[in-house]
């Protein structure tokens, strides 16, 4: 595996990610409060994308592949015959943990699924950060993937206005992620409403001008 580089992407807000999460749930028909992430990836995604594969490696084999014990999983998008082969690669202990409901392991798989959706399906580009260059959380591929992962795991609970404790218990998030996603949801809704109001205001102005 190549050295990990610091990357940036286009500006993506909470509103964008919330909309993406809702669309994904609608397309895949995942109406359950608790999202079974391994099943979602293995059954739903592989039917949706014939080029997608989930690769589970033994922990030692995974470490040999990534050369970094701190990396929990990774997503690869490899061009092949003018099409992309999409792979999520995880060690067996993370996969097994996600299967039994471990918060961190569920989040790890959801994070990689978010990368796949954003950069595999939607083909949102990433570029390498130059020396000394910084980017906001809205341009950081890792922060963005974390936000989308939280939305994917909890959007059904968020729309029901669940409390932090309820989100954690019913949707399988850690308490910290539940707190974060509640804030991100409020920001996302506020930005969506602002966009709608802006469009309506512009339409009202243009209608008056035409009259």
Give the predicted meaning of each segment:
Residues 1-211:
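Active-site hotspot residues in diverse enzymes, especially metal/ion-binding acidic/histidine motifs
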